[in-house]
């Protein structure tokens, strides 16, 4: 295990020293389902993949490792990226089965200079979609950091599990302003300076939705 941690640390250090730290992650919510995916640029991707495989094999040797968990390495190669999968059965009585269904599927994609991950039904197909979208976007200038949250899918996801009048009021309001439901946090570096400018933005639809939620809460007897 010490060797595994050392290899992971080496990849992290070499990536930082190369001067390029680049990555992205996205969460997709729909009804009672969730999909998570992302990717990162790394230096020494094969070394990182070998370390991950070794760590998993060590875990499999433990007596309490669940035998029902299915792990497959190098299942296929797509655009130079090797895929590995982990499938975890979920008993129907578990709360997680309401979101992921009968099993949790995790896919990992590794190459010389990148690592991708996906958590979704048909996780490899989902991950291929992320890889294709990343390739089609090409190289372009981006902010050092940007976090964008679309509020409507989040509230609809929550509403699929709990019928809440405040949430329902916010959903109705957001649907009157399509595409204006984002909460954005961004970081911009100042020119010729080491200073950073942080910006927090609420789109028009979000502000109105908050107001609608407050009104629904007051009407329902909630104390704000």
Which residues make up each language-model segment?
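Signature of soluble extracytoplasmic/periplasmic domains of secreted precursors
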Residues: 1-224
């Amino acid at each position: 295990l010490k060797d595994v941690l050392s290899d992971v640390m080496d990849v992290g250090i070499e990536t930082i020293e190369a001067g390029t730290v680049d990555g992205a992650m996205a969460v997709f919510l729909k009804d009672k389902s969730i999909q998570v995916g992302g990717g990162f640029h790394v230096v020494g991707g094969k070394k990182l993949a070998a370390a991950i495989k070794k760590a998993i094999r060590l875990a499999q040797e433990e007596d309490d490792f669940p035998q029902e968990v299915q792990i497959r390495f190098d299942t296929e190669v797509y655009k130079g990226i090797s895929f590995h999968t982990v499938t975890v059965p979920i008993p129907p009585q578990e709360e997680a089965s309401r979101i992921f269904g009968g099993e949790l599927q995790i896919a990992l994609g590794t190459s010389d200079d990148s690592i991708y991950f996906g958590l979704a039904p048909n996780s490899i197909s989902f991950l291929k979609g992320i890889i294709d979208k990343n390739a089609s976007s090409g190289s372009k200038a981006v902010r050092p950091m940007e976090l964008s949250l679309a509020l409507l899918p989040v509230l609809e996801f929550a509403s699929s599990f709990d019928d809440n009048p405040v949430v329902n009021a916010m959903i109705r309001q957001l649907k009157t302003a399509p595409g204006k439901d984002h909460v954005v946090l961004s970081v911009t570096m100042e020119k010729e300076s080491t200073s950073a400018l942080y910006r927090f933005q609420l789109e028009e639809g979000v502000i109105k939705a908050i107001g609608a939620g407050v009104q629904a809460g007051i009407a329902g007897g909630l104390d704000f």
